[in-house]
Amino acid sequence: MNLPVATALFTPSWHAELELAYARFGDCTRPTRRRHLGPLRVQKHLYAEGPEVCQHIIVHPPGGIAGGDRLDISARVAQGAWAQITSPGAAKWYRAAGPAYQSLNLHVADGATLEWLPQETIVYSAAQAELTTSIELEGDARLFYWDVVALGRPASGERFDLGHFQAHLDIRRDGRLLWHERQRIVGADGLLDSPIGLDGHPVFATLLVTGEIDAELLERCRSLGHEVRGDLTQLPGLLVARCLASEALLARAWLIDLWRLLRPALLGREALPPRIWNT
């Protein structure tokens, strides 16, 4: 039974923190810090691609984020190290009488690589989700970052009619701003159906990867994704890809297809999808 928002939430809020750090020792990347507070954890680090790439899976045992919750996540990748961070499933932001927050701070040192590849974020109608992401790159640090956001639950016939989704994202290299983005989508906003907004698509995705590709590879990337509305833009030192989709699975499949093409070209390694994506 669906209860009114004002009476639905009597559960206590969570304040969770996760602090990660990675360093290179010889030809191996190892985690050097895994501090957690509250219900945020990482599973045992994996080396599916060999010792150079350290993979971590972030888990949030409560299964979702409700009003008053606050998640603070930070990761630092030291010189020469390579970290790949993903998640086992969707992050769910539940309907709430008040806002919930996530702060993400990533720092990638000169010569280091970070792949931030979480699964989708589902924002239920009447949720109040506020996310802030700050990424600092040094020298020739490399970044592969994506996010997928689903508003409402279209498979269940739930539109995003109440609440809001707010996201701030800044990327800097040596203190210089590379990317600055502010999003705020309010339930039942006209932009949800407007041709200059989401045009009726409940799902949108963004990919940001450092580096530049040639025109031939750019066209190959643009030829992907017949089930989504997607495109790419090459900026100086940063490739941007965006799509609109009817389902999160379609958007995520498009991102993975791009990753398969772009990872060898920009990071010098073939793309090996984490096994957790198949579970």
Curated annotation (Swiss-Prot):
GO terms for molecular function: nickel cation binding. Its main location: cytoplasm. Keywords: Chaperone, Cytoplasm, Nickel insertion. Required for maturation of urease via the functional incorporation of the urease nickel metallocenter. UreD, UreF and UreG form a complex that acts as a GTP-hydrolysis-dependent molecular chaperone, activating the urease apoprotein by helping to assemble the nickel containing metallocenter of UreC. The UreE protein probably delivers the nickel. Belongs to the UreD family. This is Urease accessory protein UreD. It comes from Pseudomonas fluorescens (strain Pf0-1). The gene is ureD.
